[in-house]
C-alpha cells in the first residue's frame, strides 16, 4: 500500500545512526495511539488512559539494516476539543503517524475528515504519513483495502507520501515494519528537498 514509494532505495545505508526524527502520533480518541507509543518504548503492553494533553518519548529503534535511529514521538490526545491543537505539534515535523481503529467502522468517516484536514495544512504539504490500521488481530476488523477506501487515501495530495500498515499495538505486530516504511519516506523526502535546494 502507498503512492509510488515502492522503489525503496538503499539511502538508509548512508544515514548517520545518531540522526533523530520528530514524529507526531495523531488519530481519534480510543484508536490506540498511546498503546502504540508505549509498545514501541517498552516492547510490552502498557494499560493506558485517554490522553488529556500529550505524551512525549524519545525511542531508539533498530531498523532492518541494523542502524539505530532515534524517533522523538509526540502522542497528542484525540478528543474533539484537542484536535485544533494538532497543527501546533505538526509544525516542522518529519512525519505523521495516524492511528485508526480497524474495528470502529462508524467513526471511519470522522477519521477520514481529520486525516485529510491535517495533511492539507500548508506546513504539512509533503510530510510523510504512516497510517496505522490498529486492532487487526480482532476478527471483525476491516481489511486494508476497506480502510484505504473509507479513508479516501487516493484523494490525499499527490505530494503526500503515505503507507497503510496493519498492526496490533497490544502485541506489537506490524509496528516496526511501519516505522521502517515511514523512515524510508522521510529519507526520500529529505533527499528530494536537498536536490530542490541545489537547483535554486
Swiss-Prot record:
Q: Which SUPFAM superfamilies match?
A: P-loop containing nucleoside triphosphate hydrolases
| Record flagged with keyword Hydrolase | no
Which residues are recorded as binding GTP?
27-34, 75-79, 134-137
Q: Where in the cell is it found?
A: Cell membrane; Cytoplasm; Nucleus, Nucleolus
Per the record, lipidation of type N-myristoyl glycine is found at 2
InterPro entries associated with the record? P-loop_NTPase, Small_GTP-bd, Small_GTPase_ARF, Small_GTPase_ARF/SAR
The alphabetized UniProt keywords are: Cell membrane, Cytoplasm, GTP-binding, Lipoprotein, Membrane, Myristate, Nucleotide-binding, Nucleus
Gene Ontology BP annotations: brown fat cell differentiation; intracellular protein transport; vesicle-mediated transport
Q: Which SMART domains match?
A: ARF, RAB, RAS, SAR
Main subcellular location of this protein, as a coarse class: membrane
Provide one Gene Ontology cellular component: cytosol
Its post-translational modification remark reads: Myristoylated.
Quick one: effect of changing residue 79 to L? Localized in the nucleus and nucleolus
Q: Which family does it belong to?
A: Belongs to the small GTPase superfamily. Arf family.
> What does the record give as the function of this protein?
Small GTP-binding protein which cycles between an inactive GDP-bound and an active GTP-bound form, and the rate of cycling is regulated by guanine nucleotide exchange factors (GEF) and GTPase-activating proteins (GAP). GTP-binding protein that does not act as an allosteric activator of the cholera toxin catalytic subunit. Recruits CYTH1, CYTH2, CYTH3 and CYTH4 to the plasma membrane in GDP-bound form.
**Name of this chain's protein:** ADP-ribosylation factor-like protein 4A
